[in-house]
């Protein structure tokens, strides 16, 4: 008799995705981040659900309801900080997952990669609308500044911004709709993640060498299930350490002041995971130009498969490309630092140089390195 997991319509899907899935025998811990992202998503949906039971999306009570969650609800402070720091862990895993894809050439699975870019945009949108909900100073002014960027669109910009606001400024209508978006988007992310996985399983996983591994596959269970459980435990350990020891380490103190439309904070800045894009936005002295650069800094990922010039898929055996990859990482860390600094000398010029280098590396230097390495193969 055949095992039920191989015949039952639902069990068969799970079996083919997590149990009998043929997996390359040599994938490293950099391949753990996909499952960690799934774990993050589940944790965020669960903690978010419990927060939504006590939160009120109204300008007069939103800030107080968050304070009420932290003070009066049983373990409310814990759920709230798990959710806030869970977002940071989500983005750490997301950036590591993308870095892995860039380094090992996983972007050559084009459908999987493009859905991944779409997932990134959706997660960024979710994090942005979520940051507005506590209705602190940085929530309010962050929402005002970022939504205002749409006014740079010629002709329809102002109308578009007022349509998103539901009025002439960020107000009650804005908060209510942002709560609605923040509630629905994670479920859209879940659906997209399922499609992401569907397309990945059409091709199978890539591996560090970038060479097809069809002749050397092992079953996903037990080898990678146990490896993913270890990764998950380390993720939960890190999240708990962050939440229980320094819950406000990554937050902004300004968000403990209730939103006040009449008082602008001295330094408006987003959460750390958006600072690199914010630095690129600020480094262009023209509003529309800045908005376009901001969009392009993320959308450039779509073009990466087309910019592949090397005959080798992975960077494992490509020293020049490796060097440029780590320069790109250093550049992104520099942009993250600059995004959190005030707009003054020398930060302005450093930000502008880092922004130019970011686009130069992806569009010019890395494809050129690929061509040079192709020549070196013939020596």
From Swiss-Prot:
Biological process terms from the Gene Ontology for this record are:
mitochondrial electron transport, ubiquinol to cytochrome c
Give an example GO molecular function: metal ion binding
Relate the outcome reported for changing residue 327 to T.
In strain: Isolate 1B and Isolate Timor sea
Q: Which residues form the signal peptide?
A: none
Describe cofactor binding as the record notes it. Answer: Binds 2 heme b groups non-covalently.
Name the InterPro entries for this protein: Cyt_b/b6_C, Cyt_b/b6_C_sf, Cyt_b/b6_N, Cytb/b6-like_sf, Cytochrome_b, Cytochrome_b_C_euk/bac, Cytochrome_b_N_euk/bac, Di-haem_cyt_TM
Requisite cofactors: heme b
Query: Which residues does the record give as a ubiquinone binding sites?
Result: 201
* An annotated GO cellular component: respiratory chain complex III
Keywords, sorted A to Z = Electron transport, Heme, Iron, Membrane, Metal-binding, Mitochondrion, Mitochondrion inner membrane, Respiratory chain, Transmembrane, Transmembrane helix, Transport, Ubiquinone
Membrane-spanning residues: 33-53, 77-98, 113-133, 178-198, 226-246, 288-308, 320-340, 347-367
Coiled-coil residue spans: none
Q: How does it assemble?
A: The cytochrome bc1 complex contains 11 subunits: 3 respiratory subunits (MT-CYB, CYC1 and UQCRFS1), 2 core proteins (UQCRC1 and UQCRC2) and 6 low-molecular weight proteins (UQCRH/QCR6, UQCRB/QCR7, UQCRQ/QCR8, UQCR10/QCR9, UQCR11/QCR10 and a cleavage product of UQCRFS1). This cytochrome bc1 complex then forms a dimer.
Q: Per its database record, what is this protein's job?
A: Component of the ubiquinol-cytochrome c reductase complex (complex III or cytochrome b-c1 complex) that is part of the mitochondrial respiratory chain. The b-c1 complex mediates electron transfer from ubiquinol to cytochrome c. Contributes to the generation of a proton gradient across the mitochondrial membrane that is then used for ATP synthesis.
Additional info?
Heme 1 (or BL or b562) is low-potential and absorbs at about 562 nm, and heme 2 (or BH or b566) is high-potential and absorbs at about 566 nm.
Q: What's this protein's name?
A: Cytochrome b
Organism of derivation: Stenella longirostris (Spinner dolphin)
- Gene responsible for this protein: MT-CYB
């Amino acid at each position: 008799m055949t095992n039920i997991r191989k015949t039952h319509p639902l069990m068969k899907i799970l079996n083919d995705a997590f149990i009998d899935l043929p997996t390359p025998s040599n994938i490293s811990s950099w391949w753990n981040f996909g499952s960690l992202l799934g774990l993050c998503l589940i944790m965020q949906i669960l903690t978010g659900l419990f927060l939504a039971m006590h939160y009120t999306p109204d300008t007069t009570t939103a800030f107080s309801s968050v304070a009420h969650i932290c003070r009066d609800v049983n373990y409310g402070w814990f759920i709230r900080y798990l959710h806030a720091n869970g977002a940071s862990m989500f983005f750490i895993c997301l950036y590591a997952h993308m870095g892995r894809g860039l380094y090992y050439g996983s972007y050559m699975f084009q459908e999987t990669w493009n859905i991944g870019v779409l997932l990134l945009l959706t997660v960024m949108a979710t994090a942005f609308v979520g940051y507005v909900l506590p209705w602190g100073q940085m929530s309010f002014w962050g929402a005002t500044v970022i939504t205002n960027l749409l006014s740079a669109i010629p002709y329809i910009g102002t109308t578009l911004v007022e349509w998103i606001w539901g009025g002439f400024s960020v107000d009650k209508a804005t908060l209510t709709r942002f709560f609605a978006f923040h509630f629905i988007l994670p479920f859209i992310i879940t659906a997209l993640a399922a499609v992401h996985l569907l397309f990945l399983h059409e091709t199978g996983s890539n591996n560090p060498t970038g060479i097809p591994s069809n002749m050397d596959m092992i079953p996903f269970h037990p080898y990678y299930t146990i490896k993913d459980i270890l990764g998950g435990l380390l993720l939960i350990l890190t999240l708990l350490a962050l939440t229980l020891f320094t819950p406000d380490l990554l937050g902004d103190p300004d968000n403990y002041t209730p939103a006040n439309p009449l008082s602008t904070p001295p330094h408006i800045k987003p959460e750390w995971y958006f600072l690199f894009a914010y630095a690129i936005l600020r480094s262009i002295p023209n509003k529309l130009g800045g908005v376009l650069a901001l969009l392009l800094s993320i959308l450039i990922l779509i073009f990466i498969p087309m910019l592949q010039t090397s005959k080798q898929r992975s960077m494992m055996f490509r020293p020049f490309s490796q060097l440029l990859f780590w320069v790109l990482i250093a550049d992104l860390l520099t942009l993250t630092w600059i995004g959190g600094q005030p707009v003054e000398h020398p930060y302005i010029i450093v930000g502008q140089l880092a922004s130019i280098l970011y686009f130069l590396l992806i569009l010019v230097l890395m494809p050129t390195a690929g061509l040079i390495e192709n020549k070196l193969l013939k020596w």
